[in-house]
């Protein structure tokens, strides 16, 4: 039976029917998740192997979301071109701890690593942010689950109240496209299919650990 389901899913993908359904559904709910493995380039030109971001011991350890947020409040935002003279270079969390400076994906990667180390069900997410007072553009953040439900952590916010909020309160402001779970397994959101370049990507089902 399992093999039969796998064959049917393969046929659905090969025929393009599954892809067409995902494109059609993107307008309704960009947060719908699909177990498809996007290429690293879908995250950004500077993205590296996510397994490496979970390797090497961190010098800093924070065990709660609030403690993680408080540490990030002591860090400074800087674009890669200013900080590193590179168009897009993602810092390993260990390097970010030394510099305490970076852009949105550096803040988010460090928060994701800390949450994973603290045994939270956490995902690193890249998509589009459209919040009042800031330009709409590509952005990185983290989602995680705690005892009260699913939360969103946006590390570049400058107060804990805005940095960590229930996902239900802010989901309309964030349009996710691709993500990585606590096992470094990549997946996609329906929001990817709102973009012409996203609709052009053909992906295989994610490999479960």
Model-derived features: positions:
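A structural boundary/capping signal
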Residues: 1-209
